[in-house]
A protein has these predicted regions:
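Extramembrane terminal tails and long inter-domain/linker segments of multi-pass membrane proteins
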Residues: 1-22, 47-54, 195
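Residue-level detector of conserved catalytic or cofactor/ligand-binding positions
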Residues: 195-201
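Transmembrane helix-loop boundary segments of multi-pass membrane transporters
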Residues: 127-131
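Inter-helical turn/loop segments and adjacent helix faces that build the functional surface
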Residues: 152-160
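Hydrophobic cores of alpha-helical transmembrane segments in multi-pass integral membrane proteins
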Residues: 19-121, 132-153, 165-190, 200
């Protein structure tokens, strides 16, 4: 746990959450790359799937892209934000419990995607394949992250905000809007839903 110096009283930064997100980043990067190598092998030699539906290119490609987007990129973004934000604002993250809920919730989302995508449970919309319960979980975990994020800004120990913090704010808001608008749907069953605002051919 790093301690800030040069302030009225020392600040113990929550580096444990940074470490967790970093370990998750490396782990999921390896998983995503291994899936990518396997589906590349399938393109060159299709019998690699051994006739198992869950190992076919069509099932594993969404798993690969989602692993790279949500697991690798998502975790590394959170690693950077949790590390730099505390230091730029000279304050510990607003709520340690919310930080842990954010971390474990995000990893549960990734595991859920890794289980459902190979089973063919998708919305069939590229880069928004995840079924509605997982989409709703993403929204919930993002709200937890946003509350902790803006709570930290509200309790900062510096008067000004660095440009990086403004970029982080736009990241939090933009991704929330993008996710919600891109995944508007009416649930039909536990694993099926109807998309709103998309033409079906």
């Amino acid at each position: 746990m790093a301690i800030a110096s040069g302030s009225a009283s020392p600040v113990e930064y929550d580096d444990a959450i940074v470490r967790l997100f970093f370990i998750a980043t490396v782990t999921w990067a390896l998983v995503g790359m291994l899936v990518g190598v396997f589906i590349a092998l399938e393109l060159a030699w299709w019998p690699a799937n051994m006739g198992i539906a869950q190992l076919t290119f069509g099932r594993l490609r969404p798993l690969h892209t989602n692993a790279v987007i949500f697991a690798f990129c998502g975790n590394i973004c959170f690693t950077g934000i949790y590390y730099s934000m505390q230091r730029l604002l000279k304050v510990r993250m607003w709520n340690d419990t919310l930080s842990r809920l954010h971390f474990w919730g995000w990893q549960l989302i990734i595991v859920s995607a890794a289980l459902t995508l190979p089973l063919g449970l998708t919305q069939t919309h590229e880069y928004a394949e995840l079924i509605w319960p997982i989409d709703w979980a993403i929204t919930l975990v993002w709200v937890i992250f946003a509350i902790n994020f803006f709570g930290t800004i509200a309790t900062r120990r510096v008067d000004h905000l660095y440009v990086a913090i403004w970029f982080y704010m736009s990241f939090v808001i933009t991704i929330a809007v993008l996710h919600i608008v891109n995944n508007i749907q009416i649930p039909a069953t536990l694993t099926r839903s109807y998309q709103i605002g998309r033409a079906h051919v």
